Structure formats: C-alpha cells, structure tokens
A protein has these predicted regions:
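Helix-centric, low-specificity signal for extended rod-like, repetitive segments
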Residues: 1-2, 47
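A generic "folded-domain core" signal
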Residues: 13, 27-224
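Hydrophobic core
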Residues: 15-22
Length: 224
C-alpha cells in the first residue's frame, strides 16, 4: 500500500450538538478561504439542462445558509446514519451567491459507547490509505437521546475527488478513528454511505456542467 494523501481539518461553521438534536440541516459549511487552491467552477455555457441538474440534486438535501450566503448540499443518508448513532464519512457541496465556485468538503463522524477525542482518521481500501489529521479542539460530547458519545471533523477537499471515486470502486472501505489517548474504532462504510458519496459526486459533476443562472434557479426551488 502507498500513502496517497494527508489532509488537515478545514474551517467550518458547525455545532455538532445542533446537528444531532435538529438534523443535518442545522449544519453549515464555510466557503474555502481566498488564499486556498481554487475549487472547480460552474460552466459558462449551458451544457447541462435544468431537468438534468434537478434530477441530480433530487436525491440530496439543499438548504440555504443566510449567514454564509450560499447553498449547502448534503445527503439525507447522513442524517439517517446519525439518528442510528452510526459512524460515517460524508461529503458536502457548497455554492455561494456571488461566486461560481463549487466547494466540496468531507465530514467524518464518530459514534461509540466511549468518549473518543479524534486525533486522526485513516480511510483505507485494498490498495491505498488516506490519513486525515484532526484539529486539537474537541467538538464532540455525549448525546442523551442517542445514548452515545460522538465527535465530528470536517475537511476541505480542495477539488480532490479522484480518491472518492477510488473508494466507490473498492471492494471494501474502512475508516479508523484514532483518539488522542490512542484508542481506536474502525468503521466499514455501509452501502448507504457509499451511495451518499456517489450521489454527491454525481451532483458535483452535473453542477460543473451547468451555467450559473440555471444552477441558482434549481437550487432556490429545492431549498428545504
């Protein structure tokens, strides 16, 4: 196996407790900072029809963040996963009002019967592994309703989607959460988790083939 990527935690506007108590719609991504590598942008030509874009986004949840002034696109599979106290590895898309850039980020959630303050996460296939270095700040806690400990980290992907496609092609994908105390928990990505990644990547590619005006019309109509 070879080391194919080392990622640091990205900035995000999040409250993990709010996510757990109110669903994923309570979560909002922050756009990447200006000095970061520029993510992909919406097309200047209308190569994708409104119907095609609407179809690609219909499997996902679209919410508008008035503070960040943009649309967040995520999978309902993540909310269902959290309600079952299941670990997960889920991507998100974010598009601002005044910028054609499509930002993609990856959220990783730990659930378990013991507190685990995440230090790192290793995602592994039969051929490669990807190490993610977590922030020093503990954003988790104990959820009384779910009766489970949780922690959450969000990573900027800087337009790197090739390894997500590798995960989809792999026979099995595991994520090993390692705590600052050395404790670990290994999670095998479920069929629903992989489908969420597939749906987000499909929406991402379709958005990149859409013009700005069409994308905004469709996003506004799908806001929940």
């Amino acid at each position: 196996m070879k080391l194919t990527g080392l990622f640091k935690r990205g900035a995000a506007c999040l409250c993990t407790a709010a996510i757990l108590m109110s669903g994923i719609s309570a979560f909002a991504l922050s756009p990447a900072l200006p000095d970061e590598p520029a993510p992909a942008e919406l097309s200047v030509t209308n190569a994708v029809s409104e119907a095609q874009l609407r179809s690609a986004l219909s499997q996902l949840t679209v919410t508008y963040d008035s503070e960040a002034e943009g649309w967040q696109i995520d999978s309902p599979y993540e909310d269902a996963s959290m309600q079952k106290s299941s670990c997960g590895v889920y991507p998100y898309l974010f598009i601002t009002n005044d910028d054609p850039t499509v930002y993609i980020s990856l959220g990783m959630s730990y659930f378990g019967n013991k507190k685990l303050d995440m230090k790192s996460v290793r995602v592994e296939t039969e051929d490669n592994y990807y190490d993610f270095t977590c922030d020093d700040q503990f954003t988790g806690g104990y959820d009384n309703d779910l009766k489970s400990w949780f922690d959450y980290e969000l990573f900027d992907m800087d337009d790197s989607t090739s390894w997500l496609n590798e995960w989809l092609a792999a026979k099995s994908v595991t994520a090993t959460f390692t705590g600052k105390d050395g404790s670990t928990k290994t999670y095998t990505l479920t069929k629903d988790n992989l489908q969420a990644i597939r749906d987000i990547l499909n929406a991402y590619d379709t958005l990149l083939g859409s013009d700005v005006s069409t994308a905004r019309v469709v996003l506004r109509s799908l806001v929940k």
